[in-house]
A protein has these predicted regions:
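Short, well-structured N-terminal submotif of metal-dependent ribonuclease cores
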Residues: 1-63, 75-92
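Acidic, PIN/NYN-like endoribonuclease modules and their adjacent C-terminal/linker elements
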Residues: 2-27, 110-124, 132-168
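A secondary-structure boundary/capping signal
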Residues: 32-33, 67, 148
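A generic structural signal for short hydrophobic patches within well-formed alpha-helices
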Residues: 36, 68-71, 152-153
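Acidic catalytic patch
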Residues: 42, 65-69, 91-123
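A generic structural signal for well-ordered alpha-helical segments
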Residues: 54, 97-98, 138
Length: 168
């Protein structure tokens, strides 16, 4: 995992104004856990693709407690291919990335129980729960969920298909 900028990411091209709004209408991307890992781990199989996409496409991005905790859990797990020694060692890596001016932190302010956001009848497997939650969070914030997962099911989230962004 990238330590102290072993592979620098593109500089931020936008900043927040005094109200916390972004200075242009470009989309904000909520990164799923795999995108965060790919961006910060230069040994990850998708690192080059993620980095190129980030540099070429992203003006503003977001994370939430779920994606941050998922990153910490996975990259510090001993069976991860390039593990850090502990979650405590992974925290500063992620904190440095999240300190960028193009980052937003979103509180968990959507629920899969909210029928206005989610059609629970379309949640057909446990594998859809986290993806649907992140997609609903992106929709709530008028953003897009950035993922490598081409099979991500969007039908449970109202507006989900338009909010999904698959990194090619």
């Amino acid at each position: 995992v990238s330590r102290a900028g072993s592979r620098a990411l593109a500089p931020a091209s936008r900043v927040r104004d005094k109200r916390g709004d972004w200075s242009s209408g470009d989309p904000v991307f909520l990164f799923d856990v795999n995108v965060l890992i790919a961006l910060l781990d230069p040994m990850h199989t998708q690192h080059v693709r993620a980095h190129a996409w980030f540099t070429d496409t992203v003006s503003a991005w977001a994370s939430c407690a779920l994606t941050q905790n998922g990153f910490l859990r996975i990259v510090s797990h001993p069976r991860y291919s390039n593990p850090l020694a502990s979650p405590g060692e992974a925290v500063p890596v992620l904190a440095e990335f999240c300190a960028r001016p193009d980052h937003r932190f979103w509180h968990d302010d959507v629920s899969l129980l909210d029928a206005a956001a989610v059609d629970a009848r379309r949640l057909l497997s446990t594998g859809q729960v986290t993806d649907s939650y992140l997609l609903a969070l992106a929709v709530k914030h008028g953003a897009r969920l950035a993922t490598f997962d081409k099979r991500l099911v969007t039908s449970a989230v109202h507006g989900g298909e338009a909010a999904r962004h698959v990194i090619e």
